[in-house]
């Protein structure tokens, strides 16, 4: 996303999207020099979780991008902001789906551990407190999954823009809670890096931040549409 019009008074209407090509690479940083002297460099931003997918700091130094790389061709000039915004709803429903998958993995591991770990002569799955926790976790997981399916159907019909934000708000916060309780069922082993649930716990934290922080979604999307529809 770059400014393609020198007139700064245009604001976001002066932004366009371009495809930038580079070769594939291994590792967490790269340099891509151009024959005419331009240089693109990138370095992965270290994070506490979600290590299978990285965000990068990118630096463009006299890097040339051909005009034919403009997304939308000539009609796409000045439409970069609109193209970006158009993808947000899809990103939010798929983030809710990610949260559901993460919850499923955490629940399965908590259930398996509860059936295997013995405390005071009994597996912890036999204790009522553990049973209550497992039931609540499954209820939360099921609610998030069915909510996601319902919103996905709305979006298939061309609707559900606000609902995409709602399901992200619910599912991502639910994933944080569920993974916390799944880790708690594991006890001290849940805090060990060798335990998969520790990774799920850390990964869940970022879900309510990317694809629209929950505070922004609540104020700028959900509340705004609710107020407009009620007036």
Which positions does each model-derived feature cover?
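A short core secondary-structure module
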Residues: 1-38
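Fold-independent oxyanion-binding glycine-rich loops
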Residues: 2-5, 20-23, 61-63, 68, ...
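Solvent-exposed alpha-helices and their adjacent loops that cap or buttress functional pockets
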Residues: 8-12, 48-52, 75-76, 199
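Flexible, small-/acidic-enriched active-site or ligand-binding loops
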Residues: 26-62
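Cytochrome P450 core scaffold surrounding the K-helix E-X-X-R motif
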Residues: 29, 69-75
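Glycine-anchored helix-breaking recognition loops at helix->coil/strand junctions
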Residues: 44-48, 74, 111, 119
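Alpha-helical interface subdomain recognition
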Residues: 57-59, 63, 78, 86-231
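Active-site-proximal, glycine-rich beta->alpha crossover segments in alpha/beta enzymes
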Residues: 82
């Amino acid at each position: 996303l770059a400014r393609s019009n020198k007139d700064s008074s245009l604001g976001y209407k002066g932004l366009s999207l371009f495809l930038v090509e580079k070769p594939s690479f291994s590792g967490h940083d790269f340099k891509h020099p151009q024959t005419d002297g331009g240089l693109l460099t990138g370095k992965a931003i270290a994070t506490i979780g979600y290590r299978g997918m990285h965000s990068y700091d990118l630096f463009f130094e006299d890097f040339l991008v051909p005009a034919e790389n403009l997304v939308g061709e000539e009609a796409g000039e000045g439409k970069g902001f609109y193209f970006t915004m158009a993808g947000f709803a899809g990103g939010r429903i798929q983030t809710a789906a990610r949260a559901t998958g993460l919850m499923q993995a955490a629940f399965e591991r908590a259930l398996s551990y509860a059936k295997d770990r013995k405390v005071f002569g009994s597996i912890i799955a036999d204790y009522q407190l553990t049973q209550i926790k497992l039931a609540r976790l499954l209820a939360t997981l099921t609610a998030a999954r069915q909510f996601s399916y319902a919103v996905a159907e709305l979006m298939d019909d061309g609707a559900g823009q606000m609902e995409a934000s709602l399901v992200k708000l619910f599912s991502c916060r639910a994933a944080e809670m569920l993974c916390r309780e799944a880790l708690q069922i594991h006890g001290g082993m849940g805090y060990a890096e060798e335990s998969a649930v520790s990774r799920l716990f850390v990964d869940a934290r970022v879900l309510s931040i990317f694809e629209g922080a929950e505070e922004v979604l609540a104020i700028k999307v959900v509340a705004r549409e609710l107020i407009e529809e009620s007036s």
